[in-house]
Amino acid sequence: MAKVFVNKRKVITTTSDVVTEEVVTEAVRLHMSKLVKNYIESEDMYLSQHEVLKMAKKDSWKPDNRLVFNYAKYIVDTFTGYQIGVPVKIKHEDENVNEFVADFRKINDMEDSEFELAKMSSVFGHAFIYVYQDEYKQTRATYNSPINMFIVHDNSIEERPLFAVRYTFNENNQEGIGQVITNDELIDATFTTFGMVSFGERTQHIYNSIPVVGLIENEERQCIFESVKTLINALNKAASEKANDVDYFADAYLKVLGVELQEEDASQIRENRIFNLWKNGDGALPEVAFLEKPSSDTTQENLISLLK
């Protein structure tokens, strides 16, 4: 029976409070296989790397426009601006507390961090604040995306956080580094792309609880544009095909029926843009026209209007 499972993109374990390499390995593998792909898809959409740009290329002689309507970024930036465009203000009746909070927020540039956390939470559905001590023993805080960090919860009714994992890989490297973060210690660890975890040095921390806090966009931990991803992709495809049709008609082939053109005749027509054709005896009247495929302009416009 699996010791770790996912419920609403929350990683949960059925084991005790003991953090072992076996449990962490299972959690990392689950994170890699079940969650990371969707996070990267959401990040790509926010960064304008949409599905239409990744489709197979068409033949070189065919129009191949790739248009992106980045409604994902528009939705996230608009919502984040409304949510936290005005920075958070924190006050306390005790002046000493006010001073401490002001210093902490200044050192950690919390206005920027809070904005990035709000944006990140909208893109991924949730995000994390990680608190740590720097080399000067000052308490610092930074933000982390769920692509390389997650919290494992117990399976009690409260789903209490048991430990957090933070890991990263260098490009084209099969081995990564990171930490396993518990209530009382930081465990250095190595990670493989297959999800194997090996513990290293252990260091006690001062917080008496996991110094990682999750911020959620909604209970389901869905990104803010999750429900319209398919509509955005369909709009990109429809607009790209419409642009392809415009290019097709601009480069349409000319057909000339009922008269034999020599090479110099064709060249003269192209340069002067004039046709001077006449009926030759009892033969058919010469015909000049562009080759056209059936137009789907109205259908495409209706589809684009519907998707918008």
Residue ranges and their predicted role:
Residues 118-123, 154-156, 170-172, 244-247:
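A general structural signal for short secondary-structure junctions and capping/turn motifs
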Residues 7, 91, 132, 144, ...:
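A structural detector for beta-sheet-dominated domains
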Residues 1-39, 191-224, 230, 235:
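N-terminal start-of-domain structural block
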Residues 123-126, 158-161, 250, 285:
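Short, well-ordered loop/turn elements at secondary-structure boundaries
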Residues 1-139:
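Extended, helix-rich architectural segments
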Residues 128-221:
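Extended, regular secondary-structure scaffolds
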